[in-house]
């Protein structure tokens, strides 16, 4: 994958995250600033999602750990655990905020 393909895929991911948060009605604020997408919750905790263009990865920072995701077969997959990004993100949102956001189609 080249840089422009990576940026397009990451932008699509960010757009899906924002759309699904809106559709869910969850009390989750989000702000995109360049390659950084921040999700903030009522309890003032945050999840930080960041595009790492040189590595063609999307990174997710939670209260507990950092996760690195590679695009593989149409999904973003954690390079250590094998977890799928949107499934993990949904669980991380619930764990930090008790809000439910369903990222499935």
UniProtKB/Swiss-Prot annotation:
The gene is cyaY. It comes from Psychromonas ingrahamii (strain DSM 17664 / CCUG 51855 / 37). Transmembrane segments: none annotated. This is Iron-sulfur cluster assembly protein CyaY. The keyword Metal-binding applies. Involved in iron-sulfur (Fe-S) cluster assembly. May act as a regulator of Fe-S biogenesis. GO terms for biological process: iron-sulfur cluster assembly. Coiled coil: none annotated. One of its GO terms (molecular function) is ferric iron binding. Belongs to the frataxin family. Pfam families: Frataxin_Cyay. It comes from the Bacteria. The keyword Iron applies. GO terms for cellular component: cytosol. SUPFAM superfamilies: Frataxin/Nqo15-like. Keywords: Iron, Metal-binding.
């Amino acid at each position: 994958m080249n840089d422009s393909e990576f940026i397009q895929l990451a932008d699509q991911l960010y757009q899906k995250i924002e759309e699904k948060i809106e559709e869910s009605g969850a009390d989750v604020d989000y702000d995109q600033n360049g390659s950084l997408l921040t999700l903030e919750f009522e309890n003032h905790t945050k999840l930080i999602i960041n595009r790492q263009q040189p590595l063609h990865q999307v990174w997710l920072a939670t209260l507990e750990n950092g996760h690195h995701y590679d695009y593989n077969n149409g999904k973003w997959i954690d390079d250590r655990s094998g977890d799928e990004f949107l499934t993990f993100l949904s669980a991380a949102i619930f764990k930090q905020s008790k809000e439910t956001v369903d990222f499935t189609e």
